[in-house]
Amino acid sequence: MGAGEITTLIIGEVLLTLATFSAVIALIVFSIRKPIRKHKPLDMLIFDKIKPAVNTVNNKVMLFITFLGKHQFLIPANLILIFYFLLVKKQTWFSIRVITIAISSLVLMLLLKQLFQRKRPLSPLLKAAKGLSFPSGHAIMAVTFYGLLIYILQHSISIDWLRSFLTILIIALIILIGFSRIYLRVHYASDVAAGFIIGLLWLLISLAALKWLESYVTSL
């Protein structure tokens, strides 16, 4: 089998796998979307609990942390990873993982927002965010990007303590990115919690599917 045929096979298998998973998730969320369109009392309670911590310094810190989950940061970060693995490390499959997970996570997030149609909180702390609220795009993209980074670290760093230390730092960053969206009152806590769960499930499914695909293609 030639290189062109293998490339076509890879693209076809990736698209088919992701389309299947997307269809299943879409069917599930379509059946439960109505109860989620409105925020819950717990969401408002969490806003109230955070209020005493609101001040100018914390506002600046939260704005910086939330930036680490924005597309303005994640797009260049993904591109750096792609070119690093493709051109420097010569590890094509890691590049494929980055591209596939980044794009599919974005598509899934946009699809779910349109399905649920939940409005954002009415009183943002500093500045209103655009788009719909559920699930949190920052939470989904933070889990899939930084979670993939953890996966890469597990396969790249041989020093146990350093690998564990960096993993803990990245997990803390993911949690803080989600918290920053609640602090800034641009998402309800339930938006963020759902984003974390969806992002983690999608990351695990994508990694498993791509690992199987890599094994299948390399065996040809």
Residue ranges and their predicted role:
Residues T20, V24-I25, V29, S105-M109, ...:
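Alpha-helical transmembrane segments of multipass membrane proteins
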Residues G12-T17, W93-I101, L162-L169, A194:
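Alpha-helical transmembrane segments of integral membrane proteins
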Residues P35-K38, F85-F94, I157-W161:
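Membrane-interface helix-boundary motifs at transmembrane edges
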Residues M1-F73, L115-P121, L125-L126:
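N-terminal transmembrane-helix/juxtamembrane module of multi-pass inner/ER membrane proteins
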Residues G69-L86:
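Hydrophobic alpha-helical transmembrane segments
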Residues G2-G4, L122-L220:
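Membrane-embedded catalytic cores of phosphoryl/pyrophosphoryl-handling enzymes
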Residues F83-V107:
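Interfacial segments of alpha-helical transmembrane regions
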Residues A102-R118:
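Transmembrane alpha-helix/helix-exit interface in multi-pass inner-membrane proteins
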